[in-house]
Structure formats: C-alpha cells, structure tokens
C-alpha cells in the first residue's frame, strides 16, 4: 500500500510557491473602502440608531403604606389606613417612523401612563402622547409634542426576511443607554402568546425570532436589517433569569405598518378584518383523514352565515393552504395574514376540497365589536 505521507511532499512545495507569490498578487488592487477590509455594522448603526428612542413612562398608582396591605388576613381584621399616591416608573424603547414625531413602541411600555418622556439618541427630549394603543397586539403609537424633521426609519418588507439573515437589535436595555447587539433571524412564523398586560391568555401572535441579545428595556426597540430598515419591533424574550438567553421575538414590520397607518388616519381603536370562521391546524392524522398528501394548512370547522369566507364560496371541511402566496399552517398565521391586509383588503386564498385545488378572492370586512378575527361572531 502506498504511504499517504509521501504524497504530502509535492503538495507542500506547491503551497510554499503559492505563499511566496501571494503578496505580489495582493498588491495589484487596493480595497475600495473599509467594508472590504473588515466586516462592520457601523454604517448600518449610523443610519438606524438616531431613529431609536428611549421612553420613560410614569404612572401614579394608589398604594397603602403598610407592608401588610395586600395580605387578605390582615386587611380583614385591621384598618390599614388610606391609600396614598405612589409613582411607578417604566422604561422602554421606541422607533421614530415619521419625521414629525410618530413613534411606535410596545403597549406594555406605556400602558396606563400618566406622563411619557421620549429621549432621542442625541439627548433631545419630548413629551409624548399615546394616540393609539392595542393590548392584544402589544403595540402603541406615540406622537411627540412639537417635533419636526426627526430621523426616521423606513419599514422593511418583513415577508422578505429569511432564516439566517443578519439583524441588529437597537434599544436601551436596563436603562444603560442606547445599545446595539447583532444576531440572525432564527425563525419565522413563530406563534406564541401575544399581548400586553391583561391580554387574553389564548391570544396568539406571529413573530420573527432572533438570537440578537434583547433584554428588559429593549421592549419597543428596533430589529433592523442590514439596509438599516425596520424589520420588527422587539417585544419579548423567553428567559428563566429575566436576561437574554438568545431567544427574542419581534412583531413583523408589515403588521407594524398596518397599525401605524390606522393611527395616522385617526382611528380610536385598531380595527381588524373579520374572518368569521373557526379553524384548526392540519396535522398528520387529520391530513390522512382528509386524504391530503401531507400535513399543512388549516381546516375550516365552522363558518358564520355572514362570514366573508362563506360569501367567497368556502365550506366547512375546506383546507386553507395559502394567503397571498404565503403558507398558512395555524390560526396565528391566518390571523396575521388577514390583519396585515386590513379591513377593506382582498385576500387571495388557496384551498383544497375533495382532492381539488382552487384560489378564491375574499373581501375582508371589519370585525364586529368584541369579535376576534377568527371567531364565528361577536363575543364567541
């Protein structure tokens, strides 16, 4: 058997020759700019960071001075005195989307705030007024008093994001000051519990997952792409310690855009389109029962008589697979796709029935008062 080590000798000689020739080849071209020498996010940060703000919210709450005030035993037998006003402070981040002072942040950052102060990256500060807030989406829009010609971020098309894309998270974690962290898009179409304090436990959101470090104080801050555009609003993390474990979630920019558009139009509440249907994901067992080649999509279990899906010809047992070309594999995804289109929009919905496939246009109408987008009727 021929020894393998002998074949290394001519290879080493060839490598030595290449090494001697390399400097001469390298001198033939001078790098055009610093980006060709070393990877740096500095140009992205310079473009995006001025539009990311710190938000200081103050609430006046009623509290009793006694340490036993919240104990039901003591409060039953003893007079623990009157309540006194106490100040609660909250810290978060926000993103300027319009030069005249339109800022988007999380609902839980400004919920029940009596006073809001917004500080820009250049240390200018403004009083803020909430013009639209939604507990379920955990979004709020603030107007800065007397603001003009402010730096603003453009919205990215969050549907164009891909797992593995580089992203930056910008915010004010723990109040230490504006901080930038980097990571990638770890997952898309991630469903999980959504909403600010008091939101229904059953409320499911649709998020972009990232491993960029996100900590308390980053809430409402920016997740930006390498073009310096807003890809999402950082909203929550999964953590046992309260600090970053590399699992953060952002509300996609396409949903943020629909929300801000309604705020700028003067809406007093965020209006969602109403599907008037009850659906469930199609898993492997259900796919076999329905005669489908693979799991995926959502099956319609029931329709309201006035549902826009019923008007478009859908029936119980139909399987919705795509909305505007995007896969729909659960109620949260369907909810998201319809919400992004908004009331008055038209959804192109692909579906299966008895082995046949078709596409139908569904004209979306506003949800009845008190109705969730994927409920059969108001309050159901």
Model-derived segments and spans:
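Conserved catalytic motifs of ABC-family nucleotide-binding domains
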Residues: 317
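Bacterial N-terminal signal peptides
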Residues: 10-19
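N-terminal signal peptide c-region/cleavage motif recognized by signal peptidases
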Residues: 21-23
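ABC transporter nucleotide-binding domain catalytic core, centered on the Walker B motif
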Residues: 324
């Amino acid at each position: 058997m021929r020894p393998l080590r002998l074949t290394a000798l001519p290879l080493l000689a060839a490598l030595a020759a290449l090494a001697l020739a390399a400097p001469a080849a390298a001198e033939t071209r001078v790098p055009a700019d610093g980006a060709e020498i070393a990877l740096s996010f500095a140009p992205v940060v310079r473009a995006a960071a001025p539009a990311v703000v710190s938000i200081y919210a103050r609430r006046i709450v009623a509290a009793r001075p006694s340490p036993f005030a919240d104990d039901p035993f003591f409060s039953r037998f003893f007079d623990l005195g009157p309540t006194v006003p106490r100040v609660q402070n909250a810290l978060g981040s926000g993103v300027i989307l319009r030069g005249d002072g339109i800022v988007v942040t999380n609902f839980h950052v400004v919920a029940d705030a009596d006073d809001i102060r917004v500080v820009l990256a250049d240390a200018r500060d403004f009083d803020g007024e909430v013009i639209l807030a939604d507990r379920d989406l955990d979004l709020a829009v603030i107007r800065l008093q007397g603001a003009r010609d402010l730096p603003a971020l453009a919205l990215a098309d969050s549907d164009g994001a891909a797992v593995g894309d580089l992203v930056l998270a910008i915010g004010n974690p723990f109040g230490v000051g504006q901080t930038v962290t980097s990571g990638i898009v770890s997952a898309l179409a991630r469903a999980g519990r959504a909403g600010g304090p008091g939101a229904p436990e059953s409320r499911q959101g649709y998020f972009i997952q990232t491993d960029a470090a996100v900590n308390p104080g980053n809430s409402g801050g920016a997740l930006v792409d390498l073009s310096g555009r807003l890809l999402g609003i950082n909203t929550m993390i999964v953590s046992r310690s309260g600090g970053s474990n590399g699992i953060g979630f952002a509300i996609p920019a396409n949903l943020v855009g629909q929300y801000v558009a309604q705020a700028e139009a003067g809406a007093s509440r965020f209006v969602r389109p109403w599907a008037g249907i009850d659906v469930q994901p199609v898993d492997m067992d259900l796919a076999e029962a329905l005669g489908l080649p693979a799991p995926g999509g959502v099956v319609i279990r029931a329709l309201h008589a006035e549902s826009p899906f019923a008007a478009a010809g859908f029936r119980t047992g139909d399987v919705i697979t795509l909305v505007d070309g995007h896969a729909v594999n659960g109620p949260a995804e369907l909810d998201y796709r319809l919400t992004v289109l908004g009331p008055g929009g038209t959804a192109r919905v692909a579906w299966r029935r008895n082995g046949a496939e078709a596409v139908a246009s569904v004209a979306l109408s506003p949800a009845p008062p008190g109705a969730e987008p994927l409920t059969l009727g108001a309050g159901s």
